Amino acid sequence: MTSLHGAESGYRTYETPVVILHTGYDLPGQQKKEKAKRNIRLLEQELKQLGWDENAGAKDGVAKAETAGTDAKACGSEQIPYLLYQLGKSYYMMGEYGAACDWFAQGLSFDLNPALEYVIDMVETYGYALINSGQEQTALFFENIYDEFGKSADFQFLMGLIYMKNARFTEAVREFKKAAGHAECRAQGVNSYRADYNIGVIYECLGKKEEALAYYRKCGGYAPAEERIRELGWG
């Protein structure tokens, strides 16, 4: 783990067996949206105080991301890319995936440390936002950052989805299998039943029913997999 700004000196870290669950967005749909709207207002105010040029904001899309990043750097604030990340997350929580993509693009226009947790999450959530907004072809540019981010189960699972959405099934299966080979992950199931389920779906679509069945059965009672087994008369 590193600090927000990537400084690693001055303190020591170690792994503990403690799991902390954040339930801040574990709310009914409308309450979640209201909380996200409140956060957006606060984040926009903070950006304005830091000298962020609102005319280069997310509403102008990816095309202005590089210019926006340059303007932010001129303000001399290392907080700005993190605030842009939080804005993207807030729009993502509201289901406004296109707007989330624009904010993430601006946040990632900075020269950031790829080891930072928030940078890793920004990259991965950006990928899901692209998929959820119908921009799966655009998401193929994640191939270009694979060397920096592609060592985790979470990123490999995301790449599997990107390939799957683009009907590149061989690459998708490869990435899901790589994800399933990890002992640890951040998002639940991406290194186990969710990866196996998607491999099963691909094999079923390709007419490889025996292979599909084998992967569905590896999902350990995962409801969508059990449903596929029943629907196909294999249960």
Where are these regions (language model features)?
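TPR-repeat structural position
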Residues: 97, 135-136, 169, 209
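Hydrophobic/aromatic packing residues within the alpha-helices of TPR/SEL1-like helical repeat arrays
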Residues: 104, 142-143, 176, 216
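Single-residue signature of alpha-solenoid repeat helices
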Residues: 100, 138-139, 172, 212
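Start-of-helix register in tetratricopeptide repeats
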Residues: 82, 117-121, 154, 194, ...
